[in-house]
C-alpha cells in the first residue's frame, strides 16, 4: 500500500463491558454487585505495558499508525531477510530505493510533485522502522529525502522541482549530498571546493573533492555545495555523466557496510547556470538540509535501540546460567530498565519535536538536542546489549554488533556528538566556543 492517497476508515469502538441481566434473589444480587464493583475497580487500574510505557500509540493519528504499520511490514519482510549478507558483503541494493519509491516514502513530507505530504511525525516513524533493520538503509532514505529532495523543494526553481522531484520520489533517480571534504568536516565554512562563473556560456566550473558521501557511487544526481567567487556558498545540481565528475567508492568500512559510501571528485565540471539552486546563497542552505536530516536520525536511532532492547531481553529470558535465566539477575534487569527508560523518553521527545516542526515552531537547537541525546543513548544501548549477549554478542547473526558498529558512524555524521554540545552551549551561554579567536 503506497502512502500517496492513503485513506483510513475509522472504526467505532465496541464497549468492553457487557452487562448480563439475570433473575436472582436480592441477597445474591447484592453480593454480585459487590463483586462487580470490585472487579471494575481492579480492571480500571492503569496497566503498564513495557512495549509502550508512556502510551505513544494513543498520541499518533490513525494515518500515522497506518503508514508506520505498512512500512514496518515492508521493512521486516523485504529488508530484514537480506541485511545479514548485505552487511557481510558490503553491498547496497539499488532496487531498495525503487521499492521505497513505489511505497511513497521518499520525500514524504513534501506536498505535491508526486510526494505523499505526510506529517513530520509520520516521517519520523518511517525512519524508526527502517533503522530497526539497519542504519545504512535509513541513511540512504535520509539522504534521498531531507538532503536531496528538500533543498530542491526549498531552494530550487520551479523548473528544477518539476524536473527532479517526481523522479526522485519514484526512486527513478538516486541522489547524494556533497558537503564534507577531506579537510573540511565539522567546519564546513572552510570548504575548498570552488565554483567559477563563465559569463561566455552562462555556466559554472566546479573543482574540488567531497568525501564520506552516502549514495555517491550509485548516484544519478549530486547536490554539491561550493564557494563562489563572491565568497558565498551555493548549491549546485550535478548529473551523472558530466565530464570531469567521478564518484569512487570508499571500501573497508566497519560501519554502515550496507550503505554505498564514496567521494565526489570534480575536475573542471561544467554546470549550467540553471543548475544552481537560486534560493540558497550561504551555509544556511546546507544547514537547513542537515536540520531535517538530523530530525530523522533522532527517530531512526531509537528503532535500532528498540531492536537491541528486544533482542537482549529475549536472550536474557532464554539463556540459562547457574540454573536460572539471565533475566533473573538484578544487574540484567537494571540494564533493561535503563534501556527502556532512555528509549521511551527519546521517543516522546521526538514526537513533541515532530509536532512542533509541523507548526513551524522547531528551532535548530531542538533538533541538535535530540540528535545528540538519542544518538549517544542509542550507542550506549547497543553496546550494553552486545555485552549482555556475551560471546554471541559479536556474531552478526544476532545483529546487535552490527547496530553497535553502525551507531558509531551515526553518532558522528551530520554533526558530531560534541559539535551539537557546542551548539547547545552557545544557546545556553550566548557565547560560541567553536573557535578561540571569535
From Swiss-Prot:
GO biological process: one example: fatty-acyl-CoA biosynthetic process
Matching InterPro entries: Acyl-CoA_DH_CS (IPR006089), Acyl-CoA_Oxase/DH_mid-dom (IPR006091), Acyl-CoA_Oxase/DH_mid-dom_sf (IPR046373), AcylCo_DH-like_C (IPR036250), AcylCo_DH/oxidase_C (IPR009075), AcylCoA_DH/ox_N (IPR013786), AcylCoA_DH/ox_N_sf (IPR037069), AcylCoA_DH/oxidase_NM_dom_sf (IPR009100)
Cofactor(s) required, per the database record: FAD
Feature: transit peptide: 1-44
Catalytic reaction(s) noted: glutaryl-CoA + oxidized [electron-transfer flavoprotein] + 2 H(+) = (2E)-butenoyl-CoA + reduced [electron-transfer flavoprotein] + CO2
Catalytic-site annotation from UniProt: 414
Enzyme Commission designation: 1.3.8.6
Protein name (database record): Glutaryl-CoA dehydrogenase, mitochondrial
Lineage, top ranks: Eukaryota, Metazoa, Chordata, Craniata, Vertebrata
Gene field: GCDH
Amino acid at each position: 500500500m503506497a502512502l500517496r492517497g492513503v485513506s483510513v476508515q475509522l472504526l467505532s469502538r465496541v464497549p468492553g463491558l457487557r452487562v448480563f441481566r439475570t433473575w436472582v434473589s436480592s441477597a445474591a444480587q447484592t453480593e454480585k454487585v459487590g463483586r462487580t464493583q470490585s472487579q471494575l475497580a481492579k480492571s480500571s487500574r492503569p496497566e503498564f505495558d513495557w512495549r509502550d510505557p508512556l502510551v505513544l500509540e494513543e498520541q499518533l493519528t490513525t494515518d500515522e499508525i497506518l503508514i508506520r504499520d505498512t512500512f514496518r511490514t515492508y521493512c521486516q519482510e523485504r529488508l530484514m531477510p537480506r541485511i545479514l549478507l548485505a552487511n557481510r558483503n558490503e553491498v547496497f541494493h539499488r532496487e531498495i530505493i525503487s521499492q521505497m519509491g513505489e511505497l511513497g516514502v521518499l520525500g514524504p513530507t513534501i506536498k505535491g510533485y508526486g510526494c505523499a505530504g505526510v506529517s513530520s511525525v509520520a516521517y519520523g516513524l518511517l525512519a524508526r522502522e527502517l533503522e530497526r533493520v539497519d542504519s545504512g538503509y535509513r541513511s540512504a532514505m535520509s539522504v534521498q529525502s531531507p538532503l536531496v529532495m528538500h533543498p530542491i523543494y526549498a531552494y530550487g526553481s520551479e523548473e528544477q522541482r518539476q524536473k527532479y522531484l517526481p523522479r526522485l520520489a519514484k526512486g527513478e533517480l538516486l541522489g547524494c549530498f556533497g558537503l564534507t571534504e577531506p579537510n573540511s568536516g565539522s567546519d564546513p565554512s572552510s570548504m575548498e571546493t570552488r565554483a567559477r562563473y563563465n559569463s561566455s556560456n552562462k555556466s559554472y566550473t566546479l573543482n574540488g573533492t567531497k568525501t564520506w558521501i552516502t549514495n555517491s557511487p550509485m548516484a544519478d544526481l549530486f547536490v554539491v555545495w561550493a564557494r563562489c567567487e563572491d565568497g558565498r556558498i551555493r548549491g549546485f545540481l550535478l548529473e551523472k555523466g558530466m565530464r570531469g565528475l567521478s564518484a569512487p567508492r570508499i571500501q573497508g568500512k566497519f560501519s554502515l557496510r550496507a550503505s554505498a559510501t564514496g567521494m565526489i571528485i570534480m575536475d573542471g565540471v561544467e554546470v549550467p547556470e540553471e543548475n544552481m539552486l537560486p534560493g540558497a546563497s550561504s551555509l544556511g542552505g546546507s544547514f537547513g538540509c542537515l536540520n531535517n536530516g538530523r530530525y530523522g536520525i533522532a527517530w531512526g536511532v531509537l528503532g535500532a535501540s528498540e531492536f537491541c532492547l528486544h533482542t537482549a531481553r529475549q536472550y536474557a529470558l532464554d539463556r540459562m546460567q547457574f540454573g536460572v535465566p539471565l533475566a533473573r539477575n538484578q544487574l540484567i534487569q537494571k540494564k533493561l530498565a535503563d534501556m527502556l527508560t532512555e528509549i521511551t523518553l527519546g521517543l516522546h521527545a521526538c514526537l513533541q519535536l515532530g509536532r512542533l516542526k509541523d507548526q513551524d515552531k522547531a528551532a535548530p537547537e531542538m533538533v541538535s538536542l535530540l540528535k545528540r541525546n538519542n544518538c549517544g543513548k542509542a550507542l550506549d544501548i547497543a553496546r550494553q546489549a552486545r555485552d549482555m549477549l556475551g560471546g554471541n554478542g559479536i556474531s552478526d547473526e544476532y545483529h546487535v554488533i552490527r547496530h553497535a558498529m553502525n551507531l558509531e558512524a551515526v553518532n558522528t555524521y551530520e554533526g558530531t556528538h560534541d559539535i551539537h554540545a557546542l551548539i547547545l552551549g552557545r544557546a545556553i551561554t550566548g557565547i560560541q566556543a567553536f573557535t578561540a579567536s571569535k
